Amino acid sequence: MAKKSLNETSPVARFEQSLEELEQLVQKMEVGDLSLEQSLTAYERGIGLYRDCQQALEQAELRVRLLTDPARPELAQAFEPPSLDG
């Protein structure tokens, strides 16, 4: 079975993949064997991954709040993730 691309996977899987890649980048940078240019490229990629992870966590928090608001249980609804098309 072919591996799904990042855009075809679930938000949780994308979060986990982004976090794993971010951790690998941090390890490479901590070793100190990267050139300045490689370090800058890794840093830029890391910032993008961090932002992706932060957004995924915010969406997860919103989903939990929508599903578990004790003050308004009648408003609990299934979460529909945003379209990845645009």
Curated annotation (Swiss-Prot):
TM segment ranges: none
Keyword Transmembrane: no
Keywords for this protein: Cytoplasm, Exonuclease, Hydrolase, Nuclease
Intracellular or extracellular location(s): Cytoplasm
Catalysed reactions, as listed in the record: Exonucleolytic cleavage in either 5'- to 3'- or 3'- to 5'-direction to yield nucleoside 5'-phosphates
Functional summary from the UniProt entry: Bidirectionally degrades single-stranded DNA into large acid-insoluble oligonucleotides, which are then degraded further into small acid-soluble oligonucleotides.
Quaternary data: Heterooligomer composed of large and small subunits.
Protein name: Exodeoxyribonuclease 7 small subunit
Gene: xseB
